[in-house]
Amino acid sequence: MAGAASALFLLDIKGRVLVWRDYRGDVTAAQAERFFTKLIETEGDSQSNDPVAYDNGVTYMFVQHSNIYLMIASRQNCNAASLLFFLHRVVDVFKHYFEELEEESLRDNFVVVYELLDEMMDFGYPQFTEARILSEFIKTDAYRMEVTQRPPMAVTNSVSWRSEGLKFKKNEVFLDVIESVNILVNSNGQIVRSDVVGALKMRTYLSGMPECKLGLNDRILLEAQGRAIKGKAIDLEDIKFHQCVRLARFENDRTISFIPPDGSFDLMTYRLSTQVKPLIWVEAHIERHSRSRVEMLVKARSQFKDRSYATSVEIELPVPTDAYNPDVRTSLGSAAYAPEKDALVWKIQYFYGNKEHTLKADFHLPSIAAEEATPERKAPIRVKFEIPKFIVSGIQVRYLKIIEKSGYQAHPWVRYITMAGEYELRLM
């Protein structure tokens, strides 16, 4: 069998991801950016009309329709002609459903789009591409989706992610709203990359076949419905749901309704691309007092509210590769020299909001280290931390209801955590 598609992307004319579906888990959303960069690089070349491109182990096949790019990324030795034909069939199906395949129609019907992509391709292999067949399963009416009546669950095994007959002495649900902050600051102190990747992670210990309903705060719900809101809206992108979520219900009233799997799973993932203020800012100054002695002064400042605090803070500060015998003093926490990393690691257990702490260090260098010595490394400052009870996006769980026919009482637990993702400051 020919190689399969890894993922399918729908991009706007500027290369921004509108919708993407990951089929095999061997590529990431970053493939869209690499594809569009490749597309721009070849613009004007004799091969610029080639619908197939290859870069760093990934083959890209694409077609353009109106202001939309439909692109398949594959890490396998795939049949490009077959997948290009499939993309044209996808265009035909979308036109059947939405009349015009435009950016607006995709945004207004993203739940329908995901349903169609799931029916048309399975694990990267094309399945149903006839609009008439798909219409038997998925119907639309004025941008609203209606899923036709299906056979009972026992016949279709539509709850394949959950076994029947589960029993627990204590019925509990744990929901963690976790956001990872990615920051890259250049040597001039400018933020060159900033985004937040979020996930609603669940652990369920529930008997029977429970029905769960999760409601998020109004700033997300109202924005999704295109209505006026008060205060700053939460503009989430690249939203992906676990297969247990009833997408039709979410499309109708923005309620996340589902029968959960047993154990741990990601209910929902998302991304926030608006620029985020660095939660912990670090400045470092290095001064050479002689050919054999270097002094380092570091200031770390928390830039979040007083009532919050960061825990397990770890600041990795690069030092000259030939440094030895450090003398370190900190206003808070402890620091240790890690020669295997050529770094000084500063650890702070609790770092409260709107506070500044300092580190001073003296390093000795070999006496032969003069101006002719090896140039200093330009490694970045790396920061790790966790901030409990704090979320950058402002997303909040309004309610989490668990209903099961036996009528037992379940205990839901919700917590919020913000942590450092790829958090680097190239200031040294």
UniProtKB/Swiss-Prot annotation:
Superkingdom of this protein's organism: Eukaryota
Entry GO terms, CC: clathrin adaptor complex; clathrin-coated vesicle membrane; Golgi apparatus
CDD domains: AP-1_Mu1_Cterm, AP1_Mu_N
Membrane topology summary: Peripheral membrane protein
Changes seen on gene knockout: Growth retardation phenotype.
SUPFAM superfamilies named in the record: Second domain of Mu2 adaptin subunit (ap50) of ap2 adaptor, SNARE-like
Chief location bin: Golgi
GO biological process, one term: vesicle-mediated transport
Function description: Subunit of clathrin-associated adaptor protein complex 1 that plays a role in protein sorting at the trans-Golgi network and early endosomes (TGN/EE). The AP complexes mediate the recruitment of clathrin to membranes and the recognition of sorting signals within the cytosolic tails of transmembrane cargo molecules. Functions redundantly with AP1M2 in multiple post-Golgi trafficking pathways leading from the TGN to the vacuole, the plasma membrane, and the cell-division plane.
Name of the protein this chain belongs to: AP-1 complex subunit mu-1
Upper classification of the organism: Eukaryota, Viridiplantae, Streptophyta, Embryophyta, Tracheophyta
